[in-house]
Swiss-Prot record:
It comes from the Bacteria. This is Methylenetetrahydrofolate--tRNA-(uracil-5-)-methyltransferase TrmFO. Pfam families: GIDA (PF01134). Gene3D superfamilies: FAD/NAD(P)-binding domain. InterPro entries: FAD/NAD-bd_sf, MnmG-rel, MnmG-rel_CS, MnmG_N, TrmFO. It comes from Staphylococcus aureus (strain MRSA252). GO terms for biological process: tRNA methylation; tRNA wobble uridine modification.
Length: 435
């Protein structure tokens, strides 16, 4: 009898898991509640919709997520394939046209002979092999089911999405095109600020009104997607070392470094929309408008989508999951995506890739798949299943700190990262022979 796998959730992780299974001849029910039931953050019924940003972050092998992407590329990831096809200019980063990206994935999966798409809300975990990839906005009913099978309380924190603006409404006389340190093509519009302009902006941010938070949800922020107003509360200089840092962004008109810089990144292939980099926010919409208009060049800007903030849900993975993203107590159930404690689009997709490949091998009798720790994929899987501080487990991005140390110590950070990246890809190539 042919085994059919239920994959719940068609985000990046669920889409990747379904693709890896189906490409290995496994029948998949891909269950997605949208458009039958929408979430507060999604805007379409497409699979793998990008919510927080259109950037999949750095592409170079000198950063952790760049290595992760290259590993996934070599393992025929549908997410990376779609990103490469839908790429838009973004300097050294891999940014995509959201619609082209999710559209490609949606069409590929819907037309796959081994995938059946089911649009309905799931309130109970099905029998048989199941991958739960319901993401940060898991419904309350299903979240309770997960609590029941893990025996752990859910933890909540908030992801925040940055506003998107129309390029035509930007005062181009006040901004300049440049990537930090001139890396890659000049892909960012930069809004320079004097010290006086920054101080006015900063004071307005502190006075701006935030949207209310549900009383039953404790606020916890992941550093990589923290609201800029929360950063501002940490001190007047915090933003200058965060999203508004001016280093490497000298104004070509003056040759001088501004006191602060707000960067705008292209959000669509046509180049008509830009998002405000690092300005994820939970401010009320009226407050957002007032604050944004204090940024030079954006005084008369048209905001096409205001920043929003939404709950994220993840489990205490080190207590309940293994390196194959399996539930230790019920190995027929796997988790994938941000719910496992990986943080970021690419990391979420990578967890789906591991879950999908592993389950396919199990069903086909090929043995289980544990990626080497020397690979970024393997180090992420190891982190979520072995994090030392599991009493206060927090989500983690791909980074070189997760990888085992090199046998020979290299002082220069760039050279050390390059050596770790090369080792990771060598290990992956050898590991691929066993798949």
């Amino acid at each position: 009898m042919t085994q059919t796998v239920n994959v719940i959730g068609a985000g990046l992780a669920g889409s990747e898991a379904a693709y890896q299974l189906s490409e290995r001849g496994i029948k998949v029910n891909l269950i997605e509640m949208r458009p039958v039931k929408q979430t507060p953050a999604h805007h379409t019924d497409k699979f793998a919709e990008l919510v927080c940003s259109n950037s999949l972050r750095g592409n170079a092998l000198t950063n952790g997520v760049g290595v992760l992407k290259e590993e996934m590329r070599r393992l025929n990831s549908i997410i990376i394939e779609a990103a490469d096809k839908a790429r838009v200019p973004a300097g050294g980063a891999l940014a995509v046209d959201r619609h082209d990206f999710s559209g490609y994935i949606t069409e590929t999966l819907k037309n796959h002979e081994n995938i059946t798409v089911i649009n309905e809300e799931i309130n109970a975990i099905p029998d048989g092999y199941t991958i739960i990839a319901t993401g940060p906005l898991t419904t309350e009913t299903l979240a309770q089911e997960i609590v029941d099978i893990t025996g752990k309380d859910q933890l909540y924190f908030y992801d925040a999405a940055a506003p998107i603006i129309e390029k035509e409404s930007i005062d181009m006389d006040k901004v300049y095109l440049k990537s930090r340190y001139d890396k890659g093509e000049a892909a960012y519009l930069n809004c320079p600020m004097t010290e006086d302009e920054f101080n006015r902006f900063y004071d307005a941010v502190l006075e701006a009104e935030a949207a209310p938070v549900n009383s039953f949800e404790k606020e916890k922020y992941f550093e990589g997607c923290m609201p800029f107003e929360v950063m501002a509360e940490r001190g007047r200089k915090t933003l200058l070392f965060g999203p508004m840092k001016p280093v490497g962004l000298e104004d070509p008109k003056t040759g001088k470094r501004p006191y602060a810089v707000v960067q705008l990144r292209q959000d669509d292939a046509a180049g008509t929309l830009y998002n405000i980099v690092g300005f994820q926010t939970h401010l009320k919409w009226g407050a957002q408008k007032e604050v944004i208009k204090l940024i030079p060049g954006l005084e008369n800007v048209d905001i096409v989508r205001y920043g929003v903030m939404h709950r994220n849900t993840f489990i205490n993975s080190p207590d309940v999951l293994n390196e194959k993203y399996e539930l230790i107590s019920q190995p027929n159930i796997q988790f994938a995506g941000q719910m496992t404690g990986v943080e970021g689009y690419v990391e979420s997709a990578a967890s789906g890739l591991v879950a999908g490949i592993n389950l396919a091998h199990k069903i086909l009798g090929k043995g289980e798949v544990v990626f080497p720790r020397e690979t970024m994929i393997g180090s992420m899987a190891y982190y979520i299943s072995h994090a030392k501080n599991n009493k206060n487990f927090q989500p983690m991005n791909a980074n070189f700190g997760l990888l085992p140390s090199l046998e020979t110590r290299i002082k220069d950070k760039k050279e050390r990262y390059e050596a770790q990246a090369n080792r990771a890809l060598d290990y992956l190539e050898n590991f691929k022979k066993t798949l």
